[in-house]
Amino acid sequence: MTVALGFRDLGLIDYETAWHAMQRFTDGRGREAADEVWLVQHPPVFTQGQSGKAEHLLLPGNIPVVQVDRGGQVTYHGPGQLVAYLMLDVRRLGFGVRDLVTRIENTLIALLADYGVKAAAKADAPGVYVDGAKIASLGLRIRNGCSFHGLALNVDMDLEPFRRINPCGYAGLAMTQLSDQAGQIEFSEVSARLRAQLVKHLDYAEQATLTGGINHYD
């Protein structure tokens, strides 16, 4: 069991700032570098993964579209969505890609169960769903045995922009969020519960709070 998983709470941050910092963190880390999770929210943005197709961007309007290097297709990020970027040395952890995805999905399913929400994964469509509606998305990149990008959980946000795309490449895919399933919730509490579940499901002994920003990576 790895000793500690470090968490850096960055608040509301521009998507491209976080993305480029993730790339530099991953490219510059040594074999002994500690793993980190960055917890963020983003201003409104669509991101198009490596499998993305232009026809799945229906009416983006004034929301910017960023082509990125993660797996998957198009998704939306906005305030009220909890995004966790997972910078993990998966070789050191001994995880295969499928195993890592399953562990992340199980993390989210357990978190939602804490709020009395019954969720499930789908074998052919990564992410987590409640009664067929998607509540959390996954998108990862593995480089030199290390992961970056991560998960996005809809907590309490404006879901309208999802109707401007085919989320994750699926036309008409319904989206939902935790506040619609569990009523009034505290975003900070959801974040704290996510931290605990990630530590458990990724086999770390404990969590650590990291201070400082990521400006030295951008």
Swiss-Prot record:
List UniProt keywords, sorted A-Z: Acyltransferase, Cytoplasm, Transferase
Q: Does the keyword Cytoplasm apply?
A: yes
- Single GO molecular function: lipoyl(octanoyl) transferase activity
Which residues does the UniProt site feature Lowers pKa of active site Cys point to?
K134
Q: Which residues form a coiled coil?
A: none
**UniProt xrefs under HAMAP family:** LipB
Name of the protein in its database record: Octanoyltransferase
Gene behind this protein? lipB
